[in-house]
Amino acid sequence: MELIVKDAQSALTVSETTFGRDFNEALVHQVVVAYAAGARQGTRAQKTRAEVTGSGKKPWRQKGTGRARAGSVKSPIWRSGGVTFAAKPQDHSQKVNKKMYRGALKSILSELVRQDRLIIVEKFSVEAPKTKLLAQKLKDMALEDVLIITGELDENLFLAARNLYKVDVRDVAGIDPVSLIAFDKVVMTADAVKQVEEMLA
């Protein structure tokens, strides 16, 4: 299949299996959920009655005081006692097979093509690391919410994009399922397209 290269007014031949496959919603959902789960910190922690500081002595005798019976100052019922079902640090990461991950990326890229959200350009750069230059370039292309993917990370482009809301710059190694679906448009250089095809082959 062929994709139009916007700034060169030519066509780029790409793999049907990478940019023209059916959208597998269930697979994409599973991979996106797994990716988001892997980003969770999982460091929350509370103390059980066994872990809080306090005496193990019975506060008062069982009978005869008129007060409710109590066996420990560390009881979850008491102020400064332990937590009944205390949260502990957890690893939330999920295993995703390479084949599934690659399949999800291909599905997303193919859907971007179908929805006209993927824009191919011959090259994409700015002369200096100035936000103003990139903002004007994007305005000329009628782009606001955009992910820019280049073959190699252009430092000028990266620095120029840092202060722009809803604009991100990645190289091919930095793409992931969540970032691909998070932006309205994805701009990809011809060099990046070839690298993506090799990576997902």
Curated annotation (Swiss-Prot):
Keywords for the protein's UniProt record, in alphabetical order: Ribonucleoprotein, Ribosomal protein, RNA-binding, rRNA-binding
Primary role: One of the primary rRNA binding proteins, this protein initially binds near the 5'-end of the 23S rRNA. It is important during the early stages of 50S assembly. It makes multiple contacts with different domains of the 23S rRNA in the assembled 50S subunit and ribosome.
Family: Belongs to the universal ribosomal protein uL4 family.
PANTHER family, per database record: 50S RIBOSOMAL PROTEIN L4 (PTHR10746), LARGE RIBOSOMAL SUBUNIT PROTEIN UL4M (PTHR10746:SF6)
Phylogenetic classification of the source organism: Bacteria, Pseudomonadati, Pseudomonadota, Gammaproteobacteria, Enterobacterales
Entry GO terms, CC: ribonucleoprotein complex; ribosome
SUPFAM superfamilies: Ribosomal protein L4 (SSF52166)
HAMAP family for this protein: Ribosomal_uL4_B (MF_01328_B)
Name this protein carries in UniProt: Large ribosomal subunit protein uL4
Subunit structure and binding partners: Part of the 50S ribosomal subunit.
GO biological process per UniProt: translation
A Pfam family of this chain: Ribosomal_L4
Region spans: Disordered: 45-67
Gene source species: Yersinia enterocolitica serotype O:8 / biotype 1B (strain NCTC 13174 / 8081)
A GO term for molecular function: structural constituent of ribosome
Disulfide bonds: none
Taxonomy, superkingdom: Bacteria
